[in-house]
């Protein structure tokens, strides 16, 4: 990886256009209500193009996309990064194959993360098994169990990142979920990240409906 870049930067057009299109797609699916969510891509010099704070993802303009360095320091004047930028930076730092990160706030993800588990205690994961769409995550069969980790929400991003780090180091094939908040999913490029998000959201919607039918 290259060292931290400190020069003033504007995102390349391809990166900004890619992020804007991803925001429109996520908004159309109801995964980023109000100004929720954030979207990023890794740039060739290992800086990160990411949505700036406070923008509705369905109405993004390329001028809403900024560049940060590997520590989350803004390099684009006049734009403020989301506090959650640190979580994007962490994923890129710990997974050299990650080329894009998407974070959404769907109803299914939010509700399931807060559903009571055994003895009414909040669960640490959502177990997904038997679904054909699990193959979207690189497995060869539906006859497998994958767990989606759930982290307790925290407004202190450094503390939240410290909780996420061991999960990322062990490997998180589905991504991870922040309780009452939303999912983080990533892939080699934006198309892969969005496909994984779509697969995960389908699985969570199925799981929510299955629990209703119990």
Curated annotation (Swiss-Prot):
Reactions accelerated catalytically: 5-(methylsulfanyl)-D-ribulose 1-phosphate = 5-methylsulfanyl-2,3-dioxopentyl phosphate + H2O
Keywords: Amino-acid biosynthesis, Lyase, Metal-binding, Methionine biosynthesis, Zinc
GO molecular function: aldehyde-lyase activity; methylthioribulose 1-phosphate dehydratase activity; zinc ion binding
BP terms from Gene Ontology: L-methionine salvage from methylthioadenosine; pentose catabolic process
Known cofactor(s): Zn(2+)
Note on how the cofactor is bound: Binds 1 zinc ion per subunit.
Protein name per UniProt: Methylthioribulose-1-phosphate dehydratase
Source organism of the structure: Granulibacter bethesdensis (strain ATCC BAA-1260 / CGDNIH1)
